[in-house]
Amino acid sequence: MKTRKVVLIGCGAVGTSFLYSALNQGLFDEYVLIDAFDNLSKGNAWDFEDANAIMSTPAGMIKSGTYEDCADADVVVITAGVPQKPGGETRLQLVGRNAKIMEEIATNVKDSGFDGITVIASNPVDIMGSVYAKVTGFEPNKVIPSGTILDSARLQWEVAKRIKINPASLEVYVVGEHGDSSVSVFSQASVGSIPLSKYRKFSDSQKRAIHKDVMRKAYKIINTKRATFYGIGACLARICKAVLRDENVILPVSIKKNADSDIYIGWPAVVGKDGWHSPLKLTLLAEEKRGFQKSYNSLKKVFEVTWSELGRSEY
């Protein structure tokens, strides 16, 4: 029986939160940790060995490794990069500091001969996913930036609190940038099979307030504990689970919605063993559509500047 192997690149708070979530769920048989600071990957590997010993579904191997370990991996998860600074730094303001890191990672992963699925959480995640995909030349569907999966989870939670229902019974998505230009798609939200608008009507001002709460959640967390990691760690494990078990489940990840574009952007799509496919056909209201287009245009502009600053000549 083939073992399920993941290589984690970036052993900071986000990477290790993913690792802990994945280990608890018994997702992989082999875990390989890589970090620019070798002692960090070694120390975490040893620490997780101890946790693994008492897990109900222990992994067969947890070790610190190198990019050569990517060659036969099923999934590579990338969380490396510098985090947002407290005080309101946006994800897009991180781009200059993280693009060069992602370019180097992408080159190393490609050179290893890796042919699996890549899941990315490094911020700004849509831009980092776009850089990674273009540098590697991997099939677009095999690159899965986390997109708006965390934003959508936050929206689910905020709406569910207000209508007093389990979030699992609510289907509602955030689309666009994983960041300040995202759009909460209330028009397509549903409770069970019932449109949210028929289950509980929210005014436009209430919707704006909910969306603001969703968008400010990350800043609230960063300003109080310096970083977000448990939420996104759980989201990364959820994406990996969908890939490993070929669930073909709809998740709001970052995808190349336009085949002729290099831009990855948050949108619900089916996720399974071959990556993402079959983007959901959402009928957006005019205001939602304008917001999504504005978000796309913003990401496109940032990516073009980023690509040029990396010394690439296509733009």
UniProtKB/Swiss-Prot annotation:
Q: Which GO terms describe its biological process?
A: glycolytic process; lactate metabolic process
Q: Which SUPFAM superfamilies match?
A: LDH C-terminal domain-like, NAD(P)-binding Rossmann-fold domains
As its record notes, the protein acts as a catalyst of: (S)-lactate + NAD(+) = pyruvate + NADH + H(+)
Top EC class, one word: oxidoreductase
Compartmental location: Cytoplasm
Superkingdom of the source? Bacteria
Q: Which family does it belong to?
A: Belongs to the LDH/MDH superfamily. LDH family.
Q: How does it assemble?
A: Homotetramer.
Q: Provide the function of this protein.
A: Catalyzes the conversion of lactate to pyruvate.
Known PANTHER family for this protein?
L-2-HYDROXYCARBOXYLATE DEHYDROGENASE (NAD(P)(+)), L-LACTATE DEHYDROGENASE
The protein here is known as L-lactate dehydrogenase
Species of origin:
Malacoplasma penetrans (strain HF-2) (Mycoplasma penetrans)
Q: What is the lineage of its organism?
A: Bacteria, Bacillati, Mycoplasmatota, Mycoplasmoidales, Mycoplasmoidaceae
